[in-house]
Amino acid sequence: MHRLVVLSSLLALTFALPQRIRNGNGRNGGGRAQQATAQQQAAQVPQGISTAQDGSTILDDTVMHLHSRESKPKLTPKSNLPIRFKISAPADQFLPASGVPGAAATSAKGTLGANILLHGDGGQSFFDMPNQNVQANTMGVALLAPNANLFWGGGSGLQRTDGVAHAQAVNDFVQNELPARVAVNTSNIVFTGVSGGSLLMSGFFIPAQMQNFANSAVELNCGALAPQVAFQNAATVMPQTRIHYQSTQSDLTELQASIPQAVAAYEQAAVDAGMSAAQINALQTVDNTPAGGHCEFDGQDFVSGVQTMLSSYASVMQGGNGTVQGIGAPSTGVVTKGVVGNEKLKFAAGGRKREAEVENMVNMKWARQAEVFETGDVQLLSCDRTSC
C-alpha cells in the first residue's frame, strides 16, 4: 500500500526531525551544542511560490509518503518519508487545488511532460533547480531526498541502503502527487540524476520502477551504478528507455569504477532483451570527454556544470543532435556516443578524498546563500562535490 499525505507547512517537517548533537567550540570543543542535520537546515529555507527564469511559476511544497507492505499500514521511520518538491510550469497549467495564483487547469491530463530531477548528496541541485525552464514541451520537477543528510538512497558512498524505499517514493510522487497539482502528460515523463541522485536512478529506480514509465529517458550525470535490485520487466523496459551517462575526465575515483560497470550492465540487459548493437547505441550513450572534476561539465564548477547539461537536456535526451552548448574542452560538444565499443571509459586522475578533510570538502552552496549555516560545520559527506 502506498499513499502520499500533504504536509501543510514546514513546521511539521521541522518538528519531526531529530537534532544532531556535536561538541561546541569546534570539533573538539568543550561545550555541548546542537548541530542541525542538513535536512533540518533545508527545512528552514522557505517554501512557497516563486518565479522561474523563463517566467514559469515554481511551486515549492512538501508531502509525506506513507509506505507499507502490509494490508494494515504499520509505519516505520523509513516508510514515513517527507518529500519536498518543486514544480516549475506556466501558472495556468496548475490545478486550482495547488494554490498557485492563476491556476486554470481543469484536468490532470495536460500537454506538458515532466523532467524529474534527483539532486546529488547535500541537495545543491534541488535548490538551484537547473531544470526550471520549460524545454521541449517539458516542465521541470525537482525532489528533495527524504534523508537527514539529503542523500538519495540514504547510506553513503556507493552503498545506498534506503534505495528501494526512496525509489518507491519517487515513483509514487510522480504517479499520484504530480497530477494532483499540475496538468501533465504522463506519457512524457523523463528523469535526471545528479551524482548521488544518479546512483539511486541507475541502481534502484530504473530496475524497479521504470516499468511504470513507457518510452522514458534518464540522464545520469556524474554517477551511475549497475542495478542493485532485481530488474522488473527488463525485456520491455530496455527497448523503450533512453539512457545517457555523462561524466568528466577527473570524476571521483569510485565513480570512475562504478560508471563503466553500470554501462556494461545496462548494455547487457539490452542484449538480453534481444536488441542489436545498432539499437543499443541509438538508446544508450556515454561521454566523459570534458576536462574537469566531479560534475564540472563546463570545466569550471559543479553548479554551472550541472546547469550546462540541463540547459541542453532536450538536445541530448529528447531527439536532438546530442550537442551540449558550453560543455568543457576538449569536447567537440556532441556527447551522444553509443555505449557499444565505448564501455571502458578512460579517465585522468580522479578526485580523491582524505578522511581528515571530508567535512571541510563538503559544498552546499544553497545553505550559504540562504545564510543558514557554514559549509565547514556540516557533518556529512556530499556527493554533490566530494564523494558519491
Describe every region a protein language model picked out.
Residues G203-S216:
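Conserved hydrolase catalytic core segment
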Residues L112, H119-G123:
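Active-site glycine-rich loops that stabilize anionic/oxyanionic intermediates
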Residues L117-G120, A142:
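Structural cue for short, hydrophobic secondary-structure segments
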Residues G157-T186:
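Alpha/beta-hydrolase active-site loop
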